[in-house]
Structure formats: C-alpha cells, structure tokens
A protein has these predicted regions:
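Glycine-rich adenosyl-binding loop in Rossmann-like folds that engage adenosine-containing cofactors
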Residues: 74-104, 161-162, 167-220
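Conserved acidic-Pro-Pro-aromatic motif
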Residues: 135-140, 147, 211-302
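Short, hinge-like loop/turn segments at secondary-structure boundaries
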Residues: 156-158, 181-186, 269-273, 297
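Short, structurally constrained coil/turn elements
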Residues: 109, 160, 273-275
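Conserved glycine-rich SAM-binding loop
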Residues: 121, 144, 172, 233
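Short alpha-helix adjacent to the SAM-binding motif of class I
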Residues: 146-157, 265
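Divalent metal-dependent hydrolysis catalytic cores, especially in the metallo-beta-lactamase
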Residues: 141-142, 167
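S-adenosyl-L-methionine
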Residues: 1-135, 139-141, 150, 277-302
Length: 302
C-alpha cells in the first residue's frame, strides 16, 4: 500500500533534483494530479469505473471492443475487454489537467500542421487531432499489427481515414528491424532491435524520423509536431529526429516516465541542439518504484 507522505516526499525530492539539473520543471506542473500519484490506487478505481460508464458506451465488436465517446462522438477499438484503466487513456486525450495531455502550451497546432504520432496505439490522439482540426494530417507509427489494424478500423469508423496515414513500423534512432515484445497492456509493448542479418517471426521494420522524412520528402517546421509514447524508446525517437529538429524545429511532446534519466538527458540534448526551444516538463508517474516526470514538450513558437 502506498504511504502518501512517503510518496509525496519522494516526488518533492525528485522535483528538487530536476530543478537543480535544468530548472525546467515548474512547481505547478510537477504537482499536476499529484493526489492520483501519491494516494492508494484503490481510491481511484471506483471513480475511474464510474467516469468510464458515464463517458462511453462499450460494446463487443467482432474480435475487439468498440468504445464510443459521448462528448466527442469519436469511437476507437480496444483489443481486450476494457477495465476502469481505460478511463485514463481517454482522459489524457481530452483533459488538459492530465500531465500526459500532449497539446497544452507551449505546443500550438493549426489546421495546416503535420503530426508524426509515434506509438499511436488505438489512435485516439490522431482521431482527436483531425476531428478538432488541430492538424491537416497525422502519420501514425504503430509496430503492433493488431493495434495498427484496430487503428485503421477506428479511422474508417470515424470518417477520418483521409487525414490519417498508418505505418506499421517502430521508430528509433536508426533504421532496421526489431521484434515486438508484448506488454501486460495493449499500450505497453516495446521493441527489441535484432542484430543485422538475424530474423525473428515477430520482427517488424523500424525507422528513424530522419530516414522516414528523407524517403518521403517531408520537411517538418515549427508548426508541426512529433508526438511520441514509445515505451522506453522515447530518447531514441528524439535522437533519430536530429536532422529535422536542427533544421526545422518541429514541436515536441514526448513521454519521459519509462526510463529514470530520460527527462534530463532529453533536455540536455535539446538545449545543445536547439537552444531556442521553450521547454515544459509535466507531472510525475511511479512507472517503477522511482517517481519520474511524465511528459516533455518543446516549441519555438511564441
């Protein structure tokens, strides 16, 4: 069982450490939804179940579950029977109070924006971006064949397929092949690179953002966005976009909670590569026993 005082002190200590390292972690951003982080999970289970029942209709749809959201009218498909945790998947896309929400300031999108969605999973972020005219197109990278198929199904069900491209590929620091390792949840799988020449029945292609943009004659600019939730490969995604970041300064929204030192390493690299970025670090997560910042955002727009 969580000890709230102990958890709060550990978050305070980590916030102080981050402040000393780079000074880019406002206290208000560090304490976003802190009660959810430090209090016992059972206190949130009932609330999440109740909210999920009120915000969505969930029905079996062949080999998946269709989730229809009341407020937005959007639907997405989930591969396993949903539980109360699905509420948090929905909340992070529609509530700016959630530190995992990708499009808070300093990120600013427009109907002309191009978004690269790395780790698109069920596609709810992409659906919202097109539906709310936050972007003209979203290129979704999803290495899981199962999730990529459900993502496509959701795009077609919502009538948004024209604005969404789906690449069944992982994204990392280099182009190659990797095997997809399934996680305990549909949004918690990860990629493991294969040595050159090796094969594996679950192997999937992996690209870097720079290689992808080069091969597709795509140049990202300050109004575009790289969004990434890459289950631990987030720093590799960033490093593999170095050319686009140096030349075009696209906006960034990248998760930082999968690996202990990702937040500070990303900030150090971005300060060296594009010192004109405005940076924002948000929230805490106990993904493991140590509290880690949730999300890093960057933009040169004023």
């Amino acid at each position: 069982m969580k000890n709230p005082l102990s958890q709060a002190l550990r978050c305070w200590s980590e916030w102080r450490r981050q402040q000393k390292l780079h000074g880019r972690f406002a206290f208000g951003d560090a304490r976003m939804q802190l009660g959810r982080v430090i209090l016992p999970a059972r206190l949130h289970t009932w609330t999440a179940s109740s909210r999920l029942a009120n915000e969505a209709d969930i029905t079996r749809a062949d080999d998946a579950w269709q989730v229809r959201l009341h407020d937005s009218g959007l639907s997405f498909f989930w591969p396993s029977e949903p539980d109360q945790n699905l509420h948090f998947v929905i909340e992070q896309e529609f509530s700016a109070a959630n530190p995992h929400h990708y499009t808070t300031a300093p990120v600013r999108l427009s109907p002309e924006s191009t978004v690269l969605d790395v780790g698109a999973c069920e596609g709810l972020f992409a659906f919202r971006a097109i539906n709310e005219h936050l972007a003209s197109r979203v290129i979704c990278f999803e290495p899981s064949g199962r999730m990529a198929a459900l993502l496509r199904r959701g795009a077609e069900t919502n009538g948004l397929a024209d604005g969404i491209a789906i690449e069944r590929s992982g994204v990392g620091s280099q182009t190659g092949r990797a095997r997809m390792v399934a996680g305990d949840n549909p949004d918690a799988g990860y990629l493991e690179y294969l040595p050159s020449g090796d094969s594996h029945p679950d192997a999937v292609p992996v690209t870097s953002i720079d290689d992808y943009c080069r091969s597709h004659q795509l140049a990202l600019g300050p109004g575009d966005l790289i969004k990434a939730d890459a289950e631990g490969a987030d720093l590799d995604v960033l490093l593999g976009a170095g050319e686009q970041i140096r030349n075009g300064a696209p906006q960034l929204a990248i998760t930082t909670y999968h690996v202990d030192d990702h937040a500070e390493r990303m900030i150090a690299w971005l300060r060296q590569t594009r010192p004109d970025y405005r940076l924002r670090l948000k929230g805490f997560s106990f993904w493991t026993a140590k509290p880690r910042p949730v999300l890093l955002q960057a933009s040169t727009l004023r």
